């Protein structure tokens, strides 16, 4: 005679097995969401930068899509890089209309480049050289940005690094090393990370070697002084 099937076990919602399974599913969903937020979700523009990202200084990986000035650039966030398909499954847009509202404006920390001509104001010596150098150094390249803050112009102020044959390079440091900027002089919104002392040593060496704008000697004006005269009406 075939065995008589047993009655199905009635398990209540508070049974240890149910509670254990629920806890496991909940934990998995929570960890998946945290992983998505930190490593997968793309930061489209400054509105997506949460206080948590800035407080933790979460590194952001991406591509430089435009260089418009000597100390800032447009950055398209590519979370996870090549491991998450960027460059072979997912591609960075190149057309302006595709990039609209999809990039971060990054302001290099710790450095101030010579001012270009704006709104009828004159250009500062070495402003075009600084812009040309920065374009050649990072345009179209992948960089990593350590975010520090958002300034009054909705720019992300942070440390940007780019990979070269000789290793990872701090872009602010390289500008100072080549005399294409000075250590940032502003009192409001100044960000250096832990590198202010290093930046000042690089600036001092460039000045001693008369590199870039330091070759102007006594006629050299810092970007901060230049802006006071030409942009704030001070004489």
Curated annotation (Swiss-Prot):
The active site is at 107, 115, 155. Keywords: Calcium, Endonuclease, Hydrolase, Membrane, Metal-binding, Mitochondrion, Nuclease, Transmembrane, Transmembrane helix. Residues 58-216 form the TNase-like domain. Ca(2+) binds at residue 112. The keyword Iron-sulfur does not apply. It is a single-pass membrane protein. It is an enzyme of class 3 (hydrolase). This is Probable endonuclease LCL3. It holds the Pfam family SNase. PANTHER family: EBNA2 BINDING PROTEIN P100, SERINE_THREONINE-PROTEIN KINASE 31. GO terms for cellular component: membrane; mitochondrion. Its main location: mitochondrion. Its EC number is 3.1.-.-. Gene3D superfamilies: 2.40.50.90. The chain crosses the membrane at residues 11-33. Belongs to the LCL3 family. Disulfide bonds: none annotated. It is found in: Mitochondrion; Membrane. One of its GO terms (molecular function) is metal ion binding.
């Amino acid at each position: 005679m075939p065995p008589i099937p047993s009655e199905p076990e009635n398990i209540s919602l508070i049974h240890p097995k149910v509670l254990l399974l629920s806890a496991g599913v909940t934990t998995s969903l929570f960890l998946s969401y945290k992983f998505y937020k930190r490593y997968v979700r793309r930061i489209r523009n400054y509105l997506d930068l949460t206080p948590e990202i800035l407080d933790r200084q979460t590194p952001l990986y991406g591509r430089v899509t435009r260089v418009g000035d000597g100390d800032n650039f447009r950055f398209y966030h590519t979370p996870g890089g090549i491991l998450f398909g960027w460059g072979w499954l997912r591609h960075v847009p190149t057309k302006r209309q595709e990039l609209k509202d999809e990039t971060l404006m990054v302001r290099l920390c710790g450095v101030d480049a010579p001012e270009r001509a704006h709104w009828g104001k004159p250009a500062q010596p070495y402003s075009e050289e600084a812009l040309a150098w920065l374009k050649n150094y990072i345009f179209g390249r992948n960089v990593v940005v350590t975010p520090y803050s958002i300034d009054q112009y909705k720019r992300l102020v942070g440390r940007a690094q780019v990979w070269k044959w000789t290793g990872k390079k701090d872009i602010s440091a390289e500008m100072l090393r080549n005399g294409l900027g000075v250590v940032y002089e502003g009192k409001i919104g100044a960000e250096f990370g832990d590198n202010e002392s290093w930046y000042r040593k690089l600036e001092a060496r460039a000045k001693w070697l008369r590199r870039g704008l330091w070759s102007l000697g006594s006629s050299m004006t810092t970007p901060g002084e230049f802006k006071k005269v030409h942009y704030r009406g001070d004489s």
